[in-house]
Design a protein with these regions (language model features):
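S-adenosyl-L-methionine
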Residues: 140-154
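Core catalytic lobe of class I
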Residues: 1-137
Length: 154
């Protein structure tokens, strides 16, 4: 397809599926790719300044850029469940580091439409493709009816 892999990010989540014959799966693989690495943007201080520290004195700037992300799942009472919906914080973090307002965000596997929803909330434009009819309908409904339901952070 012509994409360059920038990072292979691991999303570590709680409450994996417990099994009797193997280890519990409690992570998800996220590929961060771009079309043209020479024109790719990265804003290293978009979320934390170099001097920002956690309560235990660790650099927030450095920790935020590690490739294993411990981000809580999003649960909404009465929300339709889809296997493709990532927490908005994952997408928000990627977009804040890699794009500016009015940029176009492309998601070739749109799923539930979460990338489009978060892009819109951050004043980014978006293009997405989805070939699974049920996921397409779900994403279209969310976007058409402003059914965003994303967690507010910071």
């Amino acid at each position: 397809v012509g994409f360059t892999t920038i990072n292979h990010i691991i999303w570590k989540y709680q409450f994996g599926v417990v099994t009797k014959k193997k280890f519990v799966t409690s992570h998800y693989h996220c590929l961060y790719v771009c079309k043209d690495d020479k024109q790719r943007k990265f804003f290293p201080f978009s979320r934390f300044k170099k001097e920002d520290k956690s309560e235990n004195g660790r650099s927030l700037h450095y920790r935020d850029k590690e490739d294993v992300w411990d981000i809580k799942r999003e649960y909404w009472t009465g929300d339709e469940k889809t296997p493709t919906k990532l927490p908005s914080e994952i997408i928000k973090k990627l977009l804040e580091y890699s794009s500016e307002k009015k940029d176009i965000v492309f998601d070739p596997f749109l799923g539930s439409g979460q990338t489009a929803v978060v892009s819109k909330s951050l004043n980014r434009r978006f293009i997405g493709f989805e070939i699974v009819p049920d996921y397409y309908k779900f994403a279209k409904k969310r976007l058409d009816k402003d059914m965003y339901r994303i967690k507010k952070t910071k």
